[in-house]
Amino acid sequence: VTSGEIWFKGQRIDDLPCYKRALEGMFLSFQNPIEIPGITLSSFIRSALEQRGIKLRLMQYKKELKNTMDILNIDESYADRDLNKGFSGGEKKKAEVLQMLMLNPSFAILDETDSGLDVDATKTVSLGIEEYRKKNDGSLFIITHNTKILQALSVDYTHIMVDGSLVKTSDASLIDDINANGFAQYEKDQ
């Protein structure tokens, strides 16, 4: 934040450390997810759930994890692999969407989740995002430079930011305008 304040659920959070924001129900999917050797994807998600006070019996957890992995077409063996270690770019993005679906945050920020994805992975990630929207009444903030992923989603609002400033807000029709005319018209307004 370069200026102003960030409020979430009636609480100012711009001074809160990231882990406390996560405990409040925020989720951030990174553009370039890091590899964490020694911690499996499954244990990472289960630990994050427990930190949020969600304690599932092991068999119930495994069943929910498997069902969610099936939605995202992720092989079950990935649950026992080190977090993001040796994952392709698309597999890392799917793993992040898996975490979002399992943690069910009230506010999720997806930072270029579509970056580097092939057509099939983009469809799978879009399906995961729509699944989040169906089962959660929270908010989703998608940062992207490519409108392809947005075309597969139900978009309520579209915002354009240039150099950290919000320059345009509209409904989903703004996506069509961007596809037809690009971003340049908004950049020169700055």
Which sequence ranges carry the predicted segments?
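Walker B motif beta-strand of ABC-family P-loop ATPases
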Residues: 106-112
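ABC ATPase C-loop
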Residues: 100-101
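Walker B catalytic motif
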Residues: 112-113, 120
